[in-house]
Amino acid sequence: MTRFQRVAVLGSTGSIGDSTLDVIARHPDRLGVYALSAYSRMDKLAAQAAACGAAVVVVPDDAAAARFRAAWRGKAAMPEVRVGPRTLAETAAAPECTTVMAAIVGAAGLPAALAAAQAGKRVLLANKEALVAAGSLFMAAVRENGAELLPIDSEHNAIFQCMPQGARAAAPTAPAPGVRRLLLTASGGPFRRQDPADLHEVTPAQACAHPNWSMGRKISVDSATMLNKGLEVIEAHWLFAMPSERIDVLIHPQSVVHSMVEYDDGSVLAQLGQPDMRTPIAYGLGFPERLASGVGLLDLTRWGRLDFEQPDLQRFPCLALSFAALRAGQPACVALNAANEVAVAAFLEGRLRYTWVARVIEAVLEWQAKQASVTLTSLDDVLDLDARARSFAGNLGLA
């Protein structure tokens, strides 16, 4: 009999959180909500908690807790309100919780995701930064504590589904036998055909207008710059123990083929589906079984054709910078992510031009390369380097 799962949805008010709660609500016999967390939207968090019957909510500070309590309109008892990053990690590791959806955007989601892995949970990983900034630490925690790691990014979920049946270890230490390459697909975002010379005047609204996916503002900008795909390359390296030279990116504007695995015998296995995050979320929640997701079926006759092309690195310099960071090592990946978060925040606030996002990242990577060699053996090491990289980026006069 399938075990009933009590899920902590970290970052519940974002698009991944919404989709996760939608899938959970479709399977009340198998799935329930233990905890929710949010950073700012307390009205929405209160409505979600009332609808799903969460036992716990986690908020960042006392002011947010007061806003949550003021917004509560549920007929049932108010959930326990926990405050601060430490309680977020404790909630992710709580014995009452079986499964953690790690969907907090950015490095802020790293400590709780790592705590879930250290507690041996089923971790549904939608937070790229856990692997980009702390890949070796995170994968070691999965292996050493018997955690179950299921990637939720559509690309990595697709690769996971296309891997050999015997290669589904939670944290492999070598590439799966017979696998030659991983092919990550990318839509190309809203500027796939735009002249690079015209990108200087791009506005936040234009960058956030993704042609296929509904996403938050930060990840929408990352998709436009293809830094998002670069982070996914780094993530794929850790998830599947695949060296960078065996990971390729293809532009696929229809977003129907979510990624592919090429085998030594010439076979290429692909996972296709509608561009709806409920599909990989349902896969992660139900694994190894399949759950209804609420996503409509794919009609290939409607598409008629599927296109693929190589990415233009002049238009997408952030993708090239990501491959360079992966080749340079984990400290460079920490710096890459930190610089991007600072630069994208500045762009969204109107303080930085779109084309300067890549320049900030490049400058921070050059700064990191000149630092004394550092070994990232603990979460504190990672967070210290992250803070120093953010400080350097913020003081460039560019952000």
Swiss-Prot record:
**In its UniProt record, which GO terms are filed under biological process?**
isopentenyl diphosphate biosynthetic process, methylerythritol 4-phosphate pathway involved in terpenoid biosynthetic process
Pfam families per record: DXP_redisom_C (PF08436), DXP_reductoisom (PF02670), DXPR_C (PF13288)
**EC annotation?**
1.1.1.267
Q: Which InterPro entries does the protein's record reference?
A: DXP_reductoisomerase (IPR003821), DXP_reductoisomerase_C (IPR013644), DXP_reductoisomerase_N (IPR013512), DXPR_C (IPR026877), DXPR_C_sf (IPR036169), NAD(P)-bd_dom_sf (IPR036291)
What positions does the entry give for 1-deoxy-D-xylulose 5-phosphate binding? 128, 154-155, 187, 210, 223, 228-229, 232
Does the UniProt entry include the keyword DNA repair? no
Q: Which SUPFAM superfamilies did the record assign?
A: 1-deoxy-D-xylulose-5-phosphate reductoisomerase, C-terminal domain (SSF69055), Glyceraldehyde-3-phosphate dehydrogenase-like, C-terminal domain (SSF55347), NAD(P)-binding Rossmann-fold domains (SSF51735)
The annotated pathway is: Isoprenoid biosynthesis; isopentenyl diphosphate biosynthesis via DXP pathway; isopentenyl diphosphate from 1-deoxy-D-xylulose 5-phosphate: step 1/6
The residues the record assigns to binding Mn(2+) are 153, 155, 232
What is the reaction catalyzed?
Answer: 2-C-methyl-D-erythritol 4-phosphate + NADP(+) = 1-deoxy-D-xylulose 5-phosphate + NADPH + H(+)
* Cofactor list: Mg(2+); Mn(2+)
Instruction: Please provide, alphabetically and separated by semicolons, the GO molecular function terms listed in this UniProt record.
Output: 1-deoxy-D-xylulose-5-phosphate reductoisomerase activity; manganese ion binding; NADPH binding
What keywords appear on the UniProt entry?
A: Isoprene biosynthesis, Manganese, Metal-binding, NADP, Oxidoreductase
- The record's top EC class is oxidoreductase
Residues bound to NADPH are: 13-16, 127, 129, 216
Per the entry, what this protein does is: Catalyzes the NADPH-dependent rearrangement and reduction of 1-deoxy-D-xylulose-5-phosphate (DXP) to 2-C-methyl-D-erythritol 4-phosphate (MEP).
Similarity comment: Belongs to the DXR family.
Protein name listed in UniProt: 1-deoxy-D-xylulose 5-phosphate reductoisomerase
The source organism is Bordetella parapertussis (strain 12822 / ATCC BAA-587 / NCTC 13253)
